């Protein structure tokens, strides 16, 4: 048996690769006790202010990350043990109002946390495959090599919510469409999207 001749780490380690947003390469590693998401960009790795801040602080709502250079590229390794991606969550069950409300509340808290640590909110990935959840707590991926505008990324995320919302729950549909509608306005403010009354308090 070929597997029996390998070490336990090799037997249980599995790697899956795919192309991510913005041309990033994604790789996933798992063993008996841990799981990691690895993002690779074409930029030369730099141990800059962002990486020092990420590695020296447990920033609320962000996945823990370690960075390294490899073949003139940058690799960012995220600890995802015990968590599932938002994409996987949506494949199991449609998004309900409480799920969307909880997500938005935590997302806005993360935006403020990122700003408080003088990091760039545009480096947050809002790809459903890069956002993780465990016990209803969401963890976001901050990637220094990621390009793009956070407003455009959020607009794409709202399109995902519109597709994956539970259409049997009227208030969930209302919230998903309201977020999507707001994200199409010019120069909108994400952090102000949740200052309006809850759909529970409105006639739907």
Residue ranges and their predicted role:
Residues 74-76, 131, 138-139:
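Hydrophobic residues embedded in beta-strands of well-ordered beta-sheets
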Residues 55, 92-121, 155:
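Conserved kinase catalytic-core helix
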Residues 115-134:
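Catalytic-loop of the protein kinase fold
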Residues 41-45, 50-100:
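Conserved structural core of kinase catalytic domains
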Residues 1-15, 194-204:
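Single conserved hydrophobic/aromatic residue that forms the stacking wall/gate
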Residues 22-34, 44-45, 57:
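ATP-binding glycine-rich phosphate-binding loop
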């Amino acid at each position: 048996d070929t597997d029996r001749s390998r070490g336990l780490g090799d037997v249980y380690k599995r790697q899956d690769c795919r192309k991510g947003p913005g041309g990033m390469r994604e790789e996933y590693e798992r063993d008996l006790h841990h799981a990691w998401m690895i993002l690779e960009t074409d930029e030369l790795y730099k141990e800059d202010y962002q990486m020092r801040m990420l590695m020296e602080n447990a920033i609320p709502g962000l996945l823990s990350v370690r960075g390294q250079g490899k073949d003139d590229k940058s690799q960012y390794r995220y600890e995802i043990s015990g968590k599932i991606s938002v994409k996987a969550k949506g494949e199991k069950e449609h998004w309900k109002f409480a799920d969307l409300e909880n997500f938005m509340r935590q997302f806005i808290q993360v935006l403020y946390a990122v700003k408080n640590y003088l990091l760039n909110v545009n480096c947050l990935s809002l790809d459903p495959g890069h956002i993780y959840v465990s016990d209803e707590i969401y963890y976001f991926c901050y990637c220094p090599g990621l390009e793009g505008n956070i407003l455009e990324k959020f607009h794409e995320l709202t399109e995902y919510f519109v597709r994956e919302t539970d259409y049997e729950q009227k208030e969930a549909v209302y919230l998903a469409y309201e977020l999507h509608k707001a994200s199409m306005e010019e120069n909108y403010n994400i952090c102000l999207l949740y200052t309006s009354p809850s759909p529970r308090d409105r006639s739907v």
